[in-house]
Amino acid sequence: MKVEYHTVYLKKRFPLRISRGVFEGSDNLYISLTENGHTGWGEMAPGGTEGAETAAAGQAMLEQFCATGLSASIHDTWQNAHAAGVAPCALAALDMALWDLRAKQAGVPLYALLGLARRAVVSSVTVGINPPDVVRERVPLLLARGARALKIKLGSPEGIEADQAMFAAVFEAAQGSGAVLRVDANGGWSLKDARRMMGWLAEHDVEYIEQPLVRGAEDQLPDLFKDRAMPIFVDESCRMSGDIATFFQSVDGVNLKLMKCGGITEALRIVATARAFGLKTMIGCMGESSVSIAAGASIGALFDYIDLDSHLNLDPDPATGAPFENGITLPADQPGHGGVLSHA
């Protein structure tokens, strides 16, 4: 098997500000696996909490592992790489490339290889933390592009008054569009502020709240859950399937990301575990292009909610394979997951 790596800088069209900081772009790592005329593609968006802060660090881990650790079984490869300490975001790139290759060798779309339907689920499109006047200009642009659900980032360092002012601007700009409104605080609230904001947001028809409390404050979730004004999803608090048992009684759902969990193989386990505990499921993304978004869309039929939109905020997207049509990030209807790095 031929293994190749490419590092590409992904510049965001609009810098994304969340509770933890501002993100303008990233050097993402791409891996291609070629065997018998077929090539599988994978992508890593680096991150400190995902185990590799740079593309170079991720590539070094993968080069060392791929020299001896690849197995005919994708599941065995995942377990071996995880045990060897390969960072989740780097493992995600390898894992999705292996699944892409396997589906191409079988001559079927990845969703079909996994026994899934090509189900169309509306994807959230993110509105980052911004002053109200910026939001009033940006929301119409997202709606014009076809967005039917908006995920509004709150948890502003300026406090919940700033959150309310920004949300009010989104609410005003989206009036009459029919767009569903969802909120992600990225752990930016205290328990007191979360209670207050959830009650206020419920009055404005918000569908759910994501990660209201900071990761590490899961012991406060039971207090928030018992009087919740809307469904609670956790994101940063859920990285692997084994995490779910620690908080399943205090949330309504979990948001997994391929970069957090190490790819499709573990994502399938997270979904199965969440379902066993009676939880809803969501798949999200980080600063990823169409390669990783296409991989996520391939398993989209498993999820109640989808948040696969980061490729829409790239200037340019160096990859293809994740079309956004009528508010839906569609899985590829061709062999593999469909994502390909088109220019490096």
UniProtKB/Swiss-Prot annotation:
Signal peptide: none annotated. Dipeptide epimerase with a preference for hydrophobic substrates. Catalyzes the epimerization of L-Ala-L-Thr, L-Ala-L-Met, L-Ala-L-His, L-Ala-L-Phe, L-Ala-L-Tyr, L-Ala-L-Trp, L-Ile-L-Ala, L-Ile-L-Ser, L-Ile-L-Met, L-Ile-L-His, L-Ile-L-Phe, L-Ile-L-Tyr, L-Ile-L-Trp, L-Phe-L-Met, L-Phe-L-His, L-Phe-L-Phe, L-Phe-L-Tyr, L-Phe-L-Trp, L-Phe-L-Ser, L-Phe-L-Thr and L-Phe-L-Lys (in vitro). GO terms for biological process: amino acid catabolic process; peptide metabolic process. GO terms for molecular function: magnesium ion binding; racemase and epimerase activity; racemase and epimerase activity, acting on amino acids and derivatives. Part of a large, functionally divergent protein family. Protein modeling and substrate docking was used to predict the substrate specificity, prior to biochemical analysis. Its cofactor is Mg(2+). Mg(2+) binds at D184, E210, D235. Belongs to the mandelate racemase/muconate lactonizing enzyme family. This is Hydrophobic dipeptide epimerase. It is an enzyme of class 5 (isomerase). Binds 1 Mg(2+) ion per subunit. Its EC number is 5.1.1.-. Substrate binds at T126, K151, I152, K153, K257, D307, L308, D309. Keywords: Isomerase, Magnesium, Metal-binding. It comes from the Bacteria. The keyword Repressor does not apply. Gene3D superfamilies: Enolase-like C-terminal domain, Enolase-like, N-terminal domain.
